[in-house]
Amino acid sequence: MKDNNNYNVLIVGNKGREYALAQRLQQDERVNALYFCLGNGGTQDLGENLECEHYEHIVELALKKQIHLAIISEEEPLILGLTEMLEKAGILVFGASKEAAKLEASKSYMKAFVKECGIKSASYFETNDLKEALNYIQNASFPLVIKALNKNTSIVHHQEEALKILEDALKQSNEPVIIEPFLEGFELSVTALIANDDFILLPFCQNYKRLLEGDNGVNTGGMGAIAPANFFSNELEEKIKNHIFKPTLEKLQADNTPFKGVLLAEIVIIEEKGVLEPYLLDFSVRFKDIECQTILPLVENPLLDLFLATAKGELHSLELVFSKEFVMSVALVSRNYPTSSSPKQTLYIDPVDEKKGHLILGEVEQDNGVFESSGGRVIFAIGRGKSLLEARNHAYEIAQKVHFEGMFYRKDIGFKVLDLKEYS
């Protein structure tokens, strides 16, 4: 594919991260048209939402719309090989290969991969037998982390709680469950652009995953986040590069596994004998809500340049420039999130001062200009500022511009690093 200044771009996904990516790409005069499979109620104002019946249909539509670049930010299409299908059709793709996507698709595969790489991670017990699992937890120290299927991660504090989760998990799938000790420390989300054997780290982010203030309640995909989470030395960043990302890419290359996209490492920083050490918790092979919305405002380069350099395997030609500002994001969620669905609710949105931040539309639908909630994390309030405290104030000011029945959000995002005594 020749370079041009007239790109048709396809984004595969329908959450807040896709809206965030499109919002930035739309500002690039080189982007001729934006298409979405399937998109959401917000993306239809930024481009064209396409009805995609199956993955072969996505390829057909991509050819019909003369797509120059496809960005896949949903997990399932990566796992099922959409990257390879589009590449076979001659389309440039920003997205992990099917084989690389196993790092996120299977907890069992990921733990074995990490162990072989010598990457520091929690010790673990793996089984698909309920009796074996129960025997293990009877002799284990709590809290424990139970990982089932690809996304279901639970922190449990007693045997009764663990039993219910194990029973439910092993009834749903033949995939083994992973049981780990809970690692106490400072958690970070580290996102990297990956072009086979090359990578570039984006600003560090801290995701507040628990549903309730004070980090209580169930785990979610993320109730808020802050960036940059640069509270550590350059030495720690080098450890993350050299002890987590480099061994991962070296093994992928040794296994002839192509990867041109995003790798997000969830890391916990633990103090060992007075030295800070990064331990890997999980991998994701795509941009994630809420990290994507939080770190993108810090990237001053045109996003199209990032995607093209990655997809072409030319990261060496990219010199990233990051803003000196801070960003905080707050998820505005439906009443029953994350345990069950909620009835659709009409959204009422007041004007936002764009000097202070912006809104990212997530699980929403739109009909004749009226927005309705269609899922759990409905809208994200993004605040920017010269300090983290200023970014926080702006994020919560913007959150108050949104109204819908049953809306809920955490009011303590950033408490781990700010002096919010009410929640510490």
Curated annotation (Swiss-Prot):
Q: Which reaction does it catalyse?
A: 5-phospho-beta-D-ribosylamine + glycine + ATP = N(1)-(5-phospho-beta-D-ribosyl)glycinamide + ADP + phosphate + H(+)
Record-listed E.C. numbers: 6.3.4.13
As one GO molecular function, the record gives:
metal ion binding
The record, for InterPro entries, names: ATP-grasp, ATP_grasp_subdomain_1, PreATP-grasp_dom_sf, PRibGlycinamid_synth_ATP-grasp, PRibGlycinamide_synth, PRibGlycinamide_synth_C-dom, PRibGlycinamide_synth_C_sf, PRibGlycinamide_synth_N
Which residues belong to any copy of the ATP-grasp domain? 111-312
Q: Where does ATP bind?
A: 137-189
Q: Does the keyword Nucleotide-binding apply?
A: yes
Q: Which SUPFAM superfamilies match?
A: Glutathione synthetase ATP-binding domain-like, PreATP-grasp domain, Rudiment single hybrid motif
Q: Which UniProt keywords apply?
A: ATP-binding, Ligase, Nucleotide-binding, Purine biosynthesis
Provide the top EC class.
ligase
Known pathway: Purine metabolism; IMP biosynthesis via de novo pathway; N(1)-(5-phospho-D-ribosyl)glycinamide from 5-phospho-alpha-D-ribose 1-diphosphate: step 2/2
Q: From the UniProt record, give one GO term of the biological process aspect.
A: 'de novo' IMP biosynthetic process
Superkingdom assignment: Bacteria
- What protein family does this chain belong to? Belongs to the GARS family.
NCBIfam families of this UniProt entry? purD
- UniProt-listed PANTHER family: PHOSPHORIBOSYLAMINE--GLYCINE LIGASE, PHOSPHORIBOSYLAMINE--GLYCINE LIGASE, CHLOROPLASTIC
Instruction: Spell out the protein name for this chain.
Output: Phosphoribosylamine--glycine ligase
